[in-house]
Amino acid sequence: ASYGITKGLSLQGDMETIFCMPKPSGEEEKFLKIIGMNQVPIVWRDINYDYLKSRLLEMSPEEYYSFRDHIYADFSYMHVNDLGCMEFAGGYPGNLHEEINNFSIIAGVVARQQEFDIIHAHDWLTYPAGVHAKMVSGKPLCIHVHATDFDRSRGKVNPTVYSIEKNGMDHADCIMCVSELTRRTVINEYHQDPRKVFAMHNAVYPLSQELLDIPRPEHPKEKVVTFLGRITMQKGPEYFVEAAALVLQRTRNIRFVMAGSGDMLNAMINLVAERGIADRFHFPGFMKGKQVYEVYKNSDVFVMPSVSEPFGIAPLEAMQCGTPS
């Protein structure tokens, strides 16, 4: 969703987007300015220019020095590398809340150094950073709610996560929700003023010719049914496995694919083994880029058994590939 939004904004012509991400890989498209938060110093270090050039990925030494001049507090007690920067594990590490706090600290440096008109923070992981940037700059904060903890936890809300979500919403000038369902949740469960909460539906970016030209393999003797997404509680992966077990009691000429990663992956592998359907089940792992559309094209049916889905993009992607959802 963030890719589509930033790509669309970049085509407006009169708008510049600065994308702050914890840990750039270097493979990102260059249609916008990327700031790797793991390259923004929070502790002053006297670093040689040539050494900086060899170490920095998405940042020039000049920009590093400018960020260094905007360090606003003594963070020498924090764990930093030789550049005075904090490292990020990426994904959902065990110290996730620590990384959220670290991201917020760095946002304070960025907000003091960059010039911008509005702050756009996506989901609870970046709300503290957005709030900090607003407090530093005085610029309006728009938060984008892709899901709430009521969706992710099946109603068993984590009080810490809820507190972070509500604090972000309380400080936001505008709250964008991916669906009317999410908007109602924000208003009713987080007690937000309806006048600042808007439904802004997701969409898919038109496919390139390269993706449209991906061939659809023929497998006339069997059908392929696919689950593609995060293998987490919210997405209901166990329902996909249980449904597959029921179908395979009727016919064996179907293969089931569960593509993705998540904290329930190992449990699903074990459940497939317990149901005795491992010979009909495939776990290809996390898919990205072209691989996603190759999976869709290789499927006869796409299934999304989510328990709570604010607005699922995956069915639209499958439909783009001509795969029933």
What do the PLM-derived regions correspond to, one by one?
Residues 99-106, 139-142, 150-167, 206:
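Nucleotide-sugar donor phosphate/pyrophosphate-binding loop at the beta->alpha transition
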Residues 286-287, 294-299:
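Short alpha-helical donor nucleotide-sugar binding micro-motif in glycosyltransferases
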Residues 176, 218-244:
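Conserved donor-binding/catalytic core segment of Leloir-type glycosyltransferases
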Residues 312-315:
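Short glycine/serine-rich donor-binding loops of glycosyltransferases
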Residues 307:
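Aromatic "clamp/platform" in nucleotide-sugar-dependent glycosyltransferases that forms part
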Residues 267-287:
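Nucleotide-activated donor-binding/catalytic signature segment of Leloir-type glycosyltransferases, i.e.
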Residues 181, 203:
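Carbohydrate-associated surface elements
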Residues 12, 18-111:
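A conserved catalytic-core segment of Leloir-type glycosyltransferases
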